[in-house]
């Protein structure tokens, strides 16, 4: 069964080496809500992500990919892209990549208590604004 376009749900991930922030939102409202941060690495991270996927049942995933201020790639850019590929391979969901420059800085400037989840919200809202 295909989900009507307006009702599509997305789960955004703000990937970090030790922590991953989450946000959920949908195409209809074009807003995102923070869903906390997990502190896990390796396979343990994917177990925790699977739990979130069962809870939210998103139609697609959105992953923040960091770049230098001038747009150049760096080591974490490659890590985030690898993570996005791993998500697609493990969970068979579409994965969209979003430039996440300054999202954590913006989240902290807004007074976020959980900067990673707040950054995931910003990433998801940027993505939702970019789709028709």
Question: What are the roles of these predicted feature ranges?
Answer:
Residues 2-13, 17-132:
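Phosphate- and other anionic-substrate recognition elements at nucleic-acid/protein interfaces
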């Amino acid at each position: 069964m295909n989900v009507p376009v307006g009702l599509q749900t997305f789960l955004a991930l703000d990937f970090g080496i030790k922590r991953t922030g989450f946000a959920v939102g949908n195409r209809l409202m074009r807003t995102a809500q923070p869903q906390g941060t997990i502190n896990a690495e390796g396979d343990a991270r994917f177990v925790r992500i699977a739990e979130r996927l069962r809870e939210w049942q998103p139609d697609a995933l959105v992953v923040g990919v960091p770049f230098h201020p001038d747009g150049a790639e760096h080591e974490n850019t490659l890590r985030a892209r690898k993570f996005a590929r791993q998500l697609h391979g493990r969970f068979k969901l579409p994965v969209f990549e979003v430039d996440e420059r300054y999202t954590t800085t913006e989240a902290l400037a807004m007074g976020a208590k959980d900067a990673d989840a707040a950054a995931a919200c910003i990433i998801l809202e940027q993505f939702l604004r970019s789709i028709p």
